[in-house]
Amino acid sequence: MTVTVKMLVTKVKLDVVYATDDLLEKEITTSDISRPGLEMTGYFDYYAPERLQLFGMKEWSYLTQMTSHNRYSVLKEMFKKDTPAVIVSRGLAIPEEMVQAAQEEGIALFSSRVSTSRLAGEMSYFLDASLAERTSVHGVLMDIYGMGVLIQGDSGIGKSETGLELVKRGHRLVADDRVDVFAKDEETLWGEPAEILRHLLEIRGVGIIDVMSLYGASAVKDSSQVQLAIYLENFEAGKVFDRLGNGNEEITFSGVSIPRIRIPVKTGRNVSVVIEAAAMNHRAKEMGFDATKTFEERLTRLISKNEEGK
């Protein structure tokens, strides 16, 4: 995903000090944010100009103690053509030399009243998610009881129809057909729709329907964490399926593993209700309530009791 300076400005609500239309369209290529330190003393070895440059109270205080000439020289050296933008936090007064250097070198300059640490966190969160490598997978992503569930299966097995039934039951559609998944961190997987498919469901025999138009804004969601994968497969006599729910199967996307449950599909089975139950059961397991474990413990106690009675 391409991220521009304008997108960052809109997301974190930065105030424009200096920026042309061309500078607002400049691409941000890394989520790393630099807070200049040694650079202000004139040491530029290992300086990373491709990063956003963030000035907080410490950096601003050091700058204000410099002479006007030195301040201008350092800032002009710091502002490179690869630098996407410079931001000054905490509503601090921006030195004239900084504005002059930004204009001469063609660098967008912004200010914010937000504290430095909070602003850095907001920008990093947005950039990490936006710049993360996307993997497109086939399936339907639903928000079921607040849990992101990725429904997959063979073509024509009824994934979209199941998604529609879940929407009618009060759950929310995130994406249909193509789901773009990405890792926000080492343990968190998120999914979102392709822009062209946002809020749309394709139902065989009906065509494409706009879920938001038919069922309202409460029936859709722009993105969701992906916490559970469900794979729908045709029921086959003699094929072994997990009946106790202790298979512990996982699937990995973008380096993040999530649990996967296989659900056999056959005529007359209400798949949407089964998926609801699977989502609630998974949440219960995360909270420490494992029905399978409880059953196994009861079975063990019963066997022990029967053996003692012999």
From Swiss-Prot:
Catalytic activity: [HPr protein]-L-serine + ATP = [HPr protein]-O-phospho-L-serine + ADP + H(+); [HPr protein]-O-phospho-L-serine + phosphate + H(+) = [HPr protein]-L-serine + diphosphate
UniProt binding sites for Mg(2+): 160, 202
Active site, renumbered: 138, 159, 177, 243
GO molecular-function terms, A-Z: ATP binding; magnesium ion binding; phosphorelay sensor kinase activity; protein serine/threonine kinase activity; protein serine/threonine/tyrosine kinase activity
GO BP terms: regulation of carbohydrate metabolic process
Pfam families reported in the protein's UniProt record: Hpr_kinase_C, Hpr_kinase_N
Segments of this protein annotated with the region Important for the catalytic mechanism of dephosphorylation: 264-269
UniProt enzyme class: transferase
Residues annotated to bind ATP: 153-160
Keywords per UniProt: ATP-binding, Carbohydrate metabolism, Kinase, Magnesium, Metal-binding, Multifunctional enzyme, Nucleotide-binding, Serine/threonine-protein kinase, Transferase
Job description of the protein: Catalyzes the ATP- as well as the pyrophosphate-dependent phosphorylation of a specific serine residue in HPr, a phosphocarrier protein of the phosphoenolpyruvate-dependent sugar phosphotransferase system (PTS). HprK/P also catalyzes the pyrophosphate-producing, inorganic phosphate-dependent dephosphorylation (phosphorolysis) of seryl-phosphorylated HPr (P-Ser-HPr).
Domain-related comment: The Walker A ATP-binding motif also binds Pi and PPi.
NCBIfam families from the UniProt entry: hpr-ser
Family: Belongs to the HPrK/P family.
Protein's name in the database: HPr kinase/phosphorylase
Organism: Streptococcus equi subsp. zooepidemicus (strain MGCS10565)
Gene: hprK
